[in-house]
Swiss-Prot record:
Recorded name of the encoding gene: vosA
Record's compositionally biased regions (Polar residues): 253-266
Native organism: Cochliobolus sativus (strain ND90Pr / ATCC 201652) (Common root rot and spot blotch fungus)
Ranges for domain Velvet: 46-244
Domains as described in the record: The N-terminal velvet domain contains a NF-kappa-B-like fold and is involved in DNA-binding.
Keyword Nucleus (UniProt): yes
Spans annotated as Disordered: 250-294
Domain of life: Eukaryota
Assembly and oligomerization: Forms a heterodimeric complex with VEL2; the formation of the VEL2-VOS1 complex is light-dependent.
GO BP of this protein: sporulation resulting in formation of a cellular spore
Highest classification ranks of the organism: Eukaryota, Fungi, Dikarya, Ascomycota, Pezizomycotina
Role description: Component of the velB-VosA heterodimeric complex that plays a dual role in activating genes associated with spore maturation and repressing certain development-associated genes. The complex binds DNA through the DNA-binding domain of vosA that recognizes an 11-nucleotide consensus sequence 5'-CTGGCCGCGGC-3' consisting of two motifs in the promoters of key developmental regulatory genes. Regulates spore viability, trehalose accumulation, and tolerance to thermal and oxidative as well as ion stresses. Positively regulates conidial pigmentation and pathogenicity on barley.
Knockout consequences: Reduces the amount of thehalose in conidia, tolerance to heat, oxidative and osmotic stress.
Name of the protein in question: Spore development regulator vosA
Compartments it resides in: Nucleus
Gene Ontology annotations for the cellular component aspect, listed alphabetically: nucleus
């Protein structure tokens, strides 16, 4: 019976086959992520130079020359130049240009007496952000407008100049997936990387020149002026600008007045009257915490000979407090120290 039992056990559990891992016969190709717009199309309702009106809303006045190698300590052009773009309502009745992401303005440095640029590339004479995209902001009259703001421009050459602002619109061209595949096939055929296909062109919509401004040395620089109302209005709407509450000259005058030691009695009295109340309270608390002032007032108000029932019971009648070596009352336990000289029932 034992033999048949073992045989039945083996028959119920047949031998397992060897594990064969799953092998994928064909590698799946990922679906393309390229968008498929219409080939060689441009933005509908493209702007024209005759329909755009670019104006300078805020003119620059003065700039501190930027020393080569010390660009970290440069000062921006003050006040920051701001431009406004207006489009004829006949061309764009719904004012769609306010949401146009393809509009931008570039800046270059020009001579003050001629319509000619300064020799050299823009990066040789200018520093900072030289291109601004369109900002849709509320104007001072609470109406939407298209603005280009240059809040970080510095000049590297000393003299008198003007800024030329040029308005451009990018006109993108779109390619289908087949166009991209043909470009890749051509690269593999030639065995070298080719220039990427042109995804668009741009057109110039106009330009405008700013007023003359001076670029001075540090010894002649008067400091940044107080920020204008327009700068504050745009800064409150999220535009990154450096704001200043008051002019640098006014701040230096205040420092010189406060640091002078030969003040008259009227000036010192006026400063004491303008002293904050919290500071006066701190001085009063320091004086009241002085042990000598506490004890002087205590001995002036209390007779040198104290006759109380408690002192009579302790045999201290008719003796002074100083002779008994009583400690001066401390500020945090004044009530307890005073009760040593009076009846303990004073506590209850």
């Amino acid at each position: 019976m034992a033999f048949s039992y073992n045989y039945s056990l083996q028959a119920s559990y047949p031998s397992q086959r060897a594990y064969v891992p799953y092998q994928q016969t064909q590698v799946p190709t990922p679906s393309p992520i390229y968008s498929l717009p219409i080939t060689n199309t441009t933005t509908s309702g493209a702007l024209s130079p005759s329909s755009c009106f670019l104006s300078v809303r805020q003119q620059p006045k003065e700039a501190l020359v930027t020393v080569k190698g010390k660009e970290k300590f440069r000062k921006p052009l003050d006040p920051p130049p701001m431009l406004e773009l207006k489009v004829s309502s006949d061309i764009d009745p719904s004012q769609q240009f306010l949401q146009n992401p393809y509009l931008f303005v570039s800046v270059s440095l020009y001579k003050h007496d001629k319509d000619e640029p300064i020799e050299g590339t823009p990066f040789d004479v200018l520093a900072g952000t030289l291109v601004s995209s369109l900002h849709r902001l509320k104007d001072v009259n609470n109406k939407d407008g298209a603005f280009f703001i240059f809040g970080d421009i510095s000049i590297k050459v000393q003299g008198t100049y003007r800024l030329r602002f040029t308005l451009y619109e990018l006109q993108p061209s779109y390619f289908t997936l087949s166009d991209l595949e043909q470009h890749k096939d051509l690269e593999r055929y030639q065995g070298a990387a080719l220039d990427p296909p042109e995804y668009g062109t741009y057109q110039c919509l106009g330009h405008v020149l700013s007023d003359k401004f001076n670029v001075v040395l540090p010894k002649d620089f008067k400091g940044l002026e107080e920020s204008t109302y327009l700068s504050r209005a745009f800064s409150d709407q999220g535009v990154r600008l450096r704001l200043r509450k008051e002019a640098r000259g006014m701040m230096s005058n205040k420092r010189s007045i406060s640091g002078s030691g030969d003040l008259t009695s009227d000036q010192s009295q006026q400063q004491q009257q303008q002293q904050p109340l919290a500071k006066k309270r701190r001085e009063d608390s320091v004086e009241s915490a002085n042990p000598s002032s506490l004890m002087s007032g205590f001995y002036q108000n209390v007779s040198p000979f104290v006759n109380t029932p408690y002192l009579q019971s302790q045999g201290l009648q008719g003796q002074t407090l100083q002779n008994q070596g009583l400690q001066a009352p401390v500020r945090h336990d004044t009530s307890y120290a005073w009760n040593l000289a009076y009846d303990p029932s004073f506590m209850g």
